[in-house]
């Protein structure tokens, strides 16, 4: 859309039929056919903006990124599969936890997976993520600190056979564009990141895992 003397990426948020007197309305220059924001993301941005007392525009900017996401041609294929993955076996407690999570199926539910350090909680939600990905849906794993993403990267690769998409503030603009396109096209199905990853334009988000949910790093007070 025209914005002053420059062109910017805009989003049609809602329709209005009323006429505005003494105000010149500019036309949309071009519609980007390939990308659209689904209603669930629109509703989430509205809620997020109200809850955090920020303007929807600022929240939307975090979600859609800059115009390079739309005008630059980039291969959005990220997953690099390997043939040999490690085999893991669940114990009885892990099986019970996974059975409960699987019963939820496609319904909305909030579950707490609690256990001591080293009890195998990660393996349980890995198994749950695998079922979500097998259904052609996306899974998001949130981590409280950026430095934890590299530690988790190898563990994910050992289990799933491919590297997850890693999202946080230190990622280069080019890699962010690759991930953004892959996520909105549902080509990237496993995303690991800091809290800002919540605003990515997921096409078919089926599961969110908040690892170390009690960690104060998820909160921002300033």
Language model regions located:
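Accessory, non-ATPase domains that flank or precede helicase/AAA+ motor cores in DNA-metabolism machines
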Residues: 1-194, 198-222
């Amino acid at each position: 859309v025209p914005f002053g003397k420059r062109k910017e990426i805009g989003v049609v948020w809602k329709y209005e039929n009323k006429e505005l007197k003494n105000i010149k309305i500019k036309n949309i220059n071009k519609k980007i056919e390939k990308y659209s924001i689904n209603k669930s993301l629109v509703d989430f941005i509205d809620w997020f903006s109200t809850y955090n007392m920020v303007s929807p525009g600022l929240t939307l900017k975090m979600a859609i990124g800059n115009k390079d996401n739309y005008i630059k041609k980039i291969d959005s294929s990220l997953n690099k599969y390997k043939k040999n993955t490690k085999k893991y076996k669940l114990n009885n407690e892990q099986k019970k936890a996974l059975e409960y999570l699987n019963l939820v199926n496609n319904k909305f539910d909030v579950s707490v997976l609690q256990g001591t350090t080293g009890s195998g909680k990660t393996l349980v939600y890995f198994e749950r993520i695998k079922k979500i990905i097998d259904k052609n849906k996306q899974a998001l794993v949130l981590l409280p600190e950026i430095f934890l993403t590299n530690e988790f990267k190898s563990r994910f690769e050992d289990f799933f056979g491919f590297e997850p998409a890693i999202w946080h503030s230190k990622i280069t603009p080019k890699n962010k564009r690759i991930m953004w396109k892959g996520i909105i096209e549902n080509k990237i199905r496993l995303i690991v990141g800091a809290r800002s990853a919540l605003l990515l334009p997921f096409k078919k988000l089926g599961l969110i895992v908040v690892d170390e949910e009690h960690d104060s790093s998820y909160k921002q007070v300033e």
